[in-house]
From Swiss-Prot:
The lineage of its organism: Bacteria, Pseudomonadati, Pseudomonadota, Gammaproteobacteria, Enterobacterales. It is found in: Secreted. Its main location: secreted. This is Phosphothreonine lyase OspF. The gene is ospF. GO terms for cellular component: extracellular region. Catalyzes the removal of the phosphate group from the phosphothreonine in the mitogen-activated protein kinases p38, phosphothreonine in the mitogen-activated protein kinases such as MAPK2/ERK2, MAPK3/ERK1, MAPK8 and MAPK14 in an irreversible reaction, thus preventing the downstream phosphorylation of histone H3. This epigenetic modification results in inhibition of the transcription of a specific subset of pro-inflammatory genes, and ultimately to a reduced immune response against the invading pathogen. The active site is at H104, K134. One of its GO terms (molecular function) is lyase activity. Belongs to the phosphothreonine lyase family. It comes from the Bacteria. It is an enzyme of class 4 (lyase). The keyword Lyase applies.
């Protein structure tokens, strides 16, 4: 007499979610590579972009005390269990996905409050292409921690087109924004911090560095550095 076996069905829904996300990220990067020359030429047709600086911005001391408050269209959140103070634009300008591209700004530990004072007008600007950023609460980190000696600012970049792509205009604005951050810090003679081993930067960037967090890790390596330098987004920022 045949034995009836229970009908077992493996639920692959959770696996399918993970698998479906990976090709999407890879295809987004491939599309950016394929469109590199077109975007490169389009970016160079735009004139210099001038960002309206936000006024009446909070000080570093202010945001270290806030728990949750809206300021200049950004929700600032400072939880006691987190070493970072988070800022997120209530109505994002870029409606696309985050595909891993981000910038760090590294400042000498003792000058982080002053650096924030110098950059806050741009970070809170209505013209800023960055909808989400965070800064280290220096009161909550050890002196030699990774985000204490550098990488105190993190700027997250979101795409603005379908299929997680960037428009030439957004790329141009981001390039110009990074240049403004760099020049403001340099003009104010802020001492740079130790930029992360996980990141890359060109020689003329003294404070800002780049990393794609979906295709790299925090430890860094020669292979990772080479890979990041070949990222189409990074190349469109520096070439």
């Amino acid at each position: 007499m045949p034995i009836k076996k229970p009908c077992l069905k493996l639920n692959l829904d959770s696996l399918n979610v993970v698998r479906s996300e990976i090709p999407q990220m890879l295809s987004a990067n491939e599309r950016l590579k394929n469109n590199f020359n077109i975007l490169y030429n389009q970016i160079r047709q735009y004139p210099a972009y001038y960002f309206k600086v936000a006024s009446n911005v909070p000080t570093y001391s202010d945001i270290c005390q806030f728990f949750s408050v809206m300021y200049q269209g950004f929700q600032i959140v400072n939880h006691s269990g987190d070493v970072f103070i988070h800022a997120c634009r209530e109505n994002p300008q870029s409606k696309g996905d985050f595909v891993g591209d981000k910038f760090h700004i590294s400042i000498a530990r003792e000058q982080v409050p002053l650096a924030f004072q110098i950059l806050s007008g741009l970070l809170f600007s209505e013209d800023s292409p960055i909808d989400k950023w965070k800064i280290t609460d220096m009161n909550r980190v050890s002196q030699q921690s990774r985000v204490g000696i550098g990488a105190q600012f993190t700027l997250y970049v979101k795409s603005d087109q379908e299929c997680s792509q960037y428009s030439a205009l957004l790329l141009h604005k981001i390039r110009q924004f990074i240049m403004c951050l760099e020049s403001n810090l340099l003009r104010s003679k802020i001492a740079p911090g130790e930029y992360p081993a996980s990141d890359v930067r060109p020689e003329d960037w003294k404070y800002v560095s780049y990393r794609n967090e979906l295709r790299s890790d925090r430890d860094g390596s020669e292979r990772q550095e080479q890979m990041l330098r070949e990222e189409p987004f990074y190349r469109l920022m520096i070439e």
